[in-house]
Curated annotation (Swiss-Prot):
Changing R122A: Still toxic in E.coli. This is Endoribonuclease ToxN. Keywords: Antiviral defense, Endonuclease, Hydrolase, Nuclease, Plasmid, RNA-binding, Toxin-antitoxin system, Transcription, Transcription regulation. Changing C148A: Still confers phiA2 resistance, toxic in E.coli. It holds the Pfam family ToxN_toxin. The lineage of its organism: Bacteria, Pseudomonadati, Pseudomonadota, Gammaproteobacteria, Enterobacterales. One of its GO terms (molecular function) is RNA endonuclease activity. Changing S64A: Still confers phiA2 resistance, toxic in E.coli. GO terms for biological process: defense response to virus; negative regulation of DNA-templated transcription; plasmid maintenance. Induction: Part of the toxIN operon. The operon is repressed by ToxI and ToxN together, but not by ToxI alone (ToxN alone cannot be tested as it is toxic). About 90% of transcripts terminate after toxI, approximately 10% include toxN. Constitutively expressed in P.atrosepticum strain 1043 in the presence and absence of phage phiTE infection (at protein level). Changing Y115A: Still confers phiM1 or phiS61 resistance, toxic in E.coli.
Length: 171
């Protein structure tokens, strides 16, 4: 597994249909916020599941929660590294995602945290895939709420950019 970012235009497009899609940009953010996540293949759709940095409330999240996957340093569970927010995963078009090149990032605590997150994610990729598949199924069956609307987003995401193409063809 690797880390990816996604285009702001694509995020804006999905937000037209589902306001649970996380923001990638907002004028209230003190620093630009990259939408970084991992790509999961779930029943014929590729999804980007976003990461979030560690926050105090993560301590209250149970490991069994399907809405997210807690991250910590391998072998050091006390060193919390954030979450994968599975409840906010979005179906993607590959042309709108870019590989995050960790090698070209300056050596900062943030980069070191990303490497530790990636190591933990790779070691737990089967658990992450299983949890995300279960979550999607429960949401599609109407048995879980507070997530992105996976069925609506799956219906709409492939139409991204088609309006512009249709306009160009009609000229």
């Amino acid at each position: 597994m690797k880390f990816y970012t996604i285009s702001s235009k694509y995020i804006e497009y999905l937000k037209e249909f589902d306001d649970k899609v996380p923001n990638s940009e907002d004028p209230t953010y003190q620093n630009p916020k990259a939408f970084i996540g991992i790509v999961l293949e779930i029943q014929g759709h590729k999804y980007l599941a976003p990461l979030t940095s560690p926050k105090k409330w993560h301590n209250n999240v149970k490991e069994s929660s399907l809405s997210c996957f807690k991250l910590h340093e391998n072998g050091v569970p006390e060193n919390q590294l954030g979450l994968i927010n599975l409840k906010f995963m979005i179906p993607i078009i590959e042309a709108e995602v870019s590989l995050l090149d960790l090698g070209n990032m300056p050596n900062t605590p943030y980069k070191r945290m990303l490497y530790k997150q990636l190591q933990f994610i790779r070691a737990n990729s089967d658990k992450i895939a299983s949890k995300s598949d279960t979550l999607r199924n429960l949401v599609l069956q109407g048995k879980m709420q507070g997530t992105c609307n996976f069925s609506l987003l799956e219906e709409k995401y492939r139409d991204f950019g088609k309006e512009a193409e249709d306009t160009e063809e009609g000229e």
